[in-house]
From Swiss-Prot:
Gene3D superfamilies per the UniProt record, alphabetical: HUPs, Pantoate-beta-alanine ligase, C-terminal domain
Function statement: Catalyzes the condensation of pantoate with beta-alanine in an ATP-dependent reaction via a pantoyl-adenylate intermediate.
Organism: Burkholderia multivorans (strain ATCC 17616 / 249)
Amino acids binding ATP: 26-33, 144-147, 173, 181-184
Compartment list: Cytoplasm
InterPro entries linked to this entry: Cyt_trans-like, Pantoate_ligase, Pantoate_ligase_C, Rossmann-like_a/b/a_fold
Entry similarity comment: Belongs to the pantothenate synthetase family.
Active site: 33 (proton donor)
Name this polypeptide is given: Pantothenate synthetase
Top-level taxon of the source organism: Bacteria
Stored PANTHER family: CYTIDYLATE KINASE/PANTOATE-BETA-ALANINE LIGASE, PANTOATE--BETA-ALANINE LIGASE
Enzymatic class: ligase
Residues where (R)-pantoate binds: 57, 150
Length: 279
């Protein structure tokens, strides 16, 4: 595996490749990330991964400086997955001058849910993903359903900007107790780690109630928030939305069996966890 930081060297290395499969990450890799590499290999060759902690998607009170950087360990994991190139640019490589041009998603998708609680987050995501796509020029790129809203925004961005890349969605990888794998799980204390799977269990109960025919989605969402708050969580949102566009469904859509997803974000202690479950 070649480890490359220069954009020009990356382009030289990939010249002539027309089936490249790309997996962008911020590093601190876990089994969830590695499953993306394996899925990428099913859709293209060679597989290219990137590791870049993108300052643009961190808010002023978020953990950019504390975000775990484990490059050597990540390199060893990617080598075992037969990744062809790891693109690991420095901030100077990616942003040699101030990044004045940004890619901003529409408010109806980028300003809700995560976008409401993390203003500017998806602008940072779209800007760096578009730039990485321009550098790697993949045929396919793999994103996890764990970040459901991000997946949808990136897919729509590629469609609307006519980027010649297919976005492949990867299922969420969970620990044996149901907790979705995340780099932020390492911040949990032992007691918090024992409690953390309750987020997934809460979403499962919401899913079951919707499938059983409950139609008062507002009450379902409020019950779930109240349940978590009673266990010491601080929920930002628990929301049932249409899978197609993350708009709240109306009664007719519910009766017609519109595919739905329930999404959640909540703090447990100092750690903010997100999860979702398709209905």
């Amino acid at each position: 595996m070649k480890v490359i930081s220069s954009i020009q060297e990356l382009r030289d290395q990939l010249r002539g490749q027309n089936r490249t499969a790309f997996v962008p990450t911020m590093g601190n890799l876990h089994e969830g990330h590695l499953s993306l590499m394996r899925l990428a290999r099913q859709h293209g060759d060679p597989v290219v991964a990137s590791i870049f902690v993108n300052r643009l998607q961190f808010g002023p009170n978020e953990d950019f400086d504390k975000y775990p950087r484990t490059l050597q360990d990540d390199i060893e994991k990617l080598q075992k997955e037969n990744v062809y190139v790891l693109f690991a640019p420095t901030e100077r490589d990616m942003y040699p001058e101030p990044q004045e041009y940004r890619v901003q998603p529409p408010d109806d998708l980028g300003g809700i849910l995560e976008g409401e609680f993390r203003p500017g987050f998806f602008t940072g995501v779209c800007t760096v993903v578009a730039k990485l796509m321009a550098c790697v020029q993949p045929r396919v790129a793999v994103f996890g359903k764990k970040d459901y809203q991000q997946l949808m925004i990136v897919r729509r961005m590629c469609q609307q900007l006519a980027l010649p890349v297919d976005i492949v969605a990867a299922e969420t990888v969970r620990d044996t107790d149901g907790l979705a794998l995340s780099s932020r799980n390492r911040y949990l204390s032992d007691a918090e780690r024992s409690e953390a799977p309750e987020l997934a269990r809460t979403l499962q109960r919401v899913r079951e109630r919707v499938l059983a025919g409950e139609r008062d989605l507002g009450k379902l969402e409020q019950d779930a928030r109240t349940h978590l708050a009673g266990r010491g969580w601080a929920p930002d949102y628990i929301s049932i939305r249409r899978r197609a566009n993350l708009i709240a469904p109306n009664a007719a859509e519910l009766d017609a069996g519109e595919p739905l997803v329930v999404l959640a974000a909540a703090k447990l202690g100092a750690t903010r966890l997100i999860d979702n479950l398709e209905i």
